[in-house]
Amino acid sequence: MKDAQEYLKELLRKKEELEKRMELLNKKKNKKQITDEEYQKERKKIEREFIEVMDRLAQMRYIVGQNTFY
């Protein structure tokens, strides 16, 4: 099992990656490189992953914060 701090850093990197993917997706849509259907499909996929990561981040921040009391 990974160290909690290490896992927290990994989640932060994943969050940044998803933000960059969304930015790139928006640029592609604005340049008309993808259809609206492709955009919506990929956007939903990224949003689901983002929500998962943010949920885990909140949990890990709580856990890491609790560990400082011991």
How would you name each of these model-derived features?
Residues 36-47:
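Short, charged, amphipathic alpha-helical segments
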Residues 13-16, 23, 27-30:
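Heptad-repeat alpha-helical rod positions in long coiled-coil/spectrin-like domains
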Residues 1-2, 62-70:
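Short acidic DE-rich linear segments
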Residues 8-11, 25, 57:
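Generic leucine side-chain signal with a strong bias for well-ordered alpha-helical environments
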Residues 1-13:
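Short, charge/polar-rich alpha-helical segments
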Residues 18-22, 45-65:
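Amphipathic alpha-helical coiled-coil segments
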